[in-house]
């Protein structure tokens, strides 16, 4: 598995569930992905006509594609099983939940996949608590390792 990109903003969310989905891509998008020219900035998923689309994912134009290049921020359809889509639609009707892509990778068969997560936004105090907890754990580990 070759990881192309990971979403750094996922730290701001509480992950409830993760799903693996295929992405409907054009040829120049695949070539650009292989060169790791992708940005997750403000990327999210939406339901439209009982299908899930990923919006605001920026895949840079392939530099050798000339006039046949793709639109860098076009909506991309995610390929999931019907039962997964129905389950996600049911959960997304709950307030405060959203779908966010966490990473894009090529699997062992060379197919582009995206891992999406059903998430709930963390509050500011939750983020501070998590930072404090990590800092305390780090201090404990150094104390156990060095003794003082």
From Swiss-Prot:
Keyword Cytoplasm listed: yes
GO cellular component: cytosol
Superkingdom of the organism of origin: Bacteria
Cellular compartment(s): Cytoplasm
Main location as per UniProt: cytoplasm
GO molecular function terms noted in the UniProt entry: RNA binding
PROSITE patterns associated with the record: SSRP
Keywords, ordered alphabetically: Cytoplasm, RNA-binding
Biological processes, Gene Ontology terms: trans-translation
Annotated InterPro entries: SmpB, SsrA-bd_prot, SsrA-bd_prot_CS
NCBIfam families membership: PRK05422.1 (NF003843), smpB (TIGR00086)
Family: Belongs to the SmpB family.
PANTHER family xref list: SSRA-BINDING PROTEIN (PTHR30308:SF2), TMRNA-BINDING COMPONENT OF TRANS-TRANSLATION TAGGING COMPLEX (PTHR30308)
Function: Required for rescue of stalled ribosomes mediated by trans-translation. Binds to transfer-messenger RNA (tmRNA), required for stable association of tmRNA with ribosomes. tmRNA and SmpB together mimic tRNA shape, replacing the anticodon stem-loop with SmpB. tmRNA is encoded by the ssrA gene; the 2 termini fold to resemble tRNA(Ala) and it encodes a 'tag peptide', a short internal open reading frame. During trans-translation Ala-aminoacylated tmRNA acts like a tRNA, entering the A-site of stalled ribosomes, displacing the stalled mRNA.
Protein name per its UniProtKB record: SsrA-binding protein
Organism: Pseudothermotoga lettingae (strain ATCC BAA-301 / DSM 14385 / NBRC 107922 / TMO) (Thermotoga lettingae)
């Amino acid at each position: 598995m070759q990881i192309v990109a990971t979403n750094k903003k996922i730290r701001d969310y509480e992950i409830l569930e993760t799903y693996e989905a295929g992405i409907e891509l054009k040829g120049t998008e695949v070539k650009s992905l292989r060169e790791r020219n992708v940005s997750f900035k403000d990327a999210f998923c939406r339901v439209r006509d009982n299908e899930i689309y990923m919006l605001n994912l920026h895949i840079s134009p392939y530099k050798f594609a000339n006039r046949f290049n793709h639109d860098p921020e076009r909506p991309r359809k995610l390929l999931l099983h019907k039962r997964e889509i129905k389950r996600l639609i049911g959960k997304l009707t709950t307030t405060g939940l959203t779908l966010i892509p966490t990473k894009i990778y090529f699997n062992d068969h060379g197919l582009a996949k995206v891992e999406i997560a059903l998430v709930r936004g963390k509050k500011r105090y939750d983020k501070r608590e998590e930072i404090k907890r990590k800092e305390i754990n780090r201090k404990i580990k150094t104390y156990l390792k060095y003794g003082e």
